[in-house]
Amino acid sequence: MARLAINVDHVATVRQARRASEPDPVTAAALAELAGAHGIVVHLREDRRHIQDRDVQVLRQTVKSKLNLEMAATREMIQIALNIKPEMVTLVPEKRQELTTEGGLDVVSFEGALEEAIKTLHEGGIAVSLFINPDPRHIKVAHRLEAEYVEIHTGMFAEADSYTRRQEEYERVVTSAKLARKLGLGAHAGHGIGYQNVLWLRNIPEIQEFSIGHAVIARAVLVGMERAVREMLALVNG
């Protein structure tokens, strides 16, 4: 049975639109857990556009399942992670002008810097996942870097504009997930996953966890957080 981790970034996006105190992503995370979510994900960006330092601090105290902190591999963020001590850190690329994370980490070009970041996080007792494109080369580098997990970027699959293209991208995800598991890495998937396309991805037995945010938060606006999470859980393990 695959696990479902809920990203609550966009609850904070609504809050920050008015620089208000609500909706609170901490409350949303608690509701997601009550509905059966296996983990909570937040991305503390360098520009603090949605999730704030306070959110991560309070979530560390309140999350009962697993807290996964997405972040860039910068000195500032690594120190924050060492102070907060989430169960897992997912290292992601970050550009200030992007609306959301646009692609996977270039682990090939930045292997040296990532090696140092991963070593530091491991010394702090934190498991590491790398958000990477579905590329066998990147899977192999992640293994060489001794990351515990990879999160396979499913954005190209989700945004495919034809059935043929979607099938091609799906096969890339399948191949990457199989290789990750063969090498002993945990295989997660995330980005662009919704209530329709998850029906494809749930058929990949090697994927152990789905990280889903925008689709669930958008659905929650209409039907409530708990129902939105329960519906996605039913699809993930249908």
UniProtKB/Swiss-Prot annotation:
Transferase keyword on record: yes
Residue positions of the active site: H43 (proton acceptor), E70 (proton acceptor), H191 (proton donor)
Biological process per Gene Ontology, one example term: pyridoxine biosynthetic process
Pathway this chain belongs to: Cofactor biosynthesis; pyridoxine 5'-phosphate biosynthesis; pyridoxine 5'-phosphate from D-erythrose 4-phosphate: step 5/5
UniProt GO MF annotations: pyridoxine 5'-phosphate synthase activity
CDD domains on file: PNPsynthase
Known role: Catalyzes the complicated ring closure reaction between the two acyclic compounds 1-deoxy-D-xylulose-5-phosphate (DXP) and 3-amino-2-oxopropyl phosphate (1-amino-acetone-3-phosphate or AAP) to form pyridoxine 5'-phosphate (PNP) and inorganic phosphate.
Subunit structure: Homooctamer; tetramer of dimers.
Residues reported to bind 1-deoxy-D-xylulose 5-phosphate: D9, H10, R45, H50, T100
Top-level division of the source organism's lineage: Bacteria
Matches recorded under PANTHER family: PYRIDOXINE 5'-PHOSPHATE SYNTHASE (PTHR30456:SF0)
InterPro entries in UniProt: Aldolase_TIM, PyrdxlP_synth_PdxJ, Pyridoxine-5'_phos_synth
Pfam families attached to this UniProt entry: PdxJ
Localization of this protein: Cytoplasm
EC number(s) on file: 2.6.99.2
Reaction(s) this enzyme catalyzes, per UniProt: 3-amino-2-oxopropyl phosphate + 1-deoxy-D-xylulose 5-phosphate = pyridoxine 5'-phosphate + phosphate + 2 H2O + H(+)
Provenance organism: Syntrophobacter fumaroxidans (strain DSM 10017 / MPOB)
GO cellular component, one term: cytosol
Site feature (Transition state stabilizer) residues: E151
Protein name according to UniProt: Pyridoxine 5'-phosphate synthase
Family from the record: Belongs to the PNP synthase family.
Principal place of residence: cytoplasm
Protein keywords: Cytoplasm, Pyridoxine biosynthesis, Transferase
Binding site for 3-amino-2-oxopropyl phosphate: N7, R18, G192, G213, H214
Gene3D superfamilies (UniProt xref): Aldolase class I
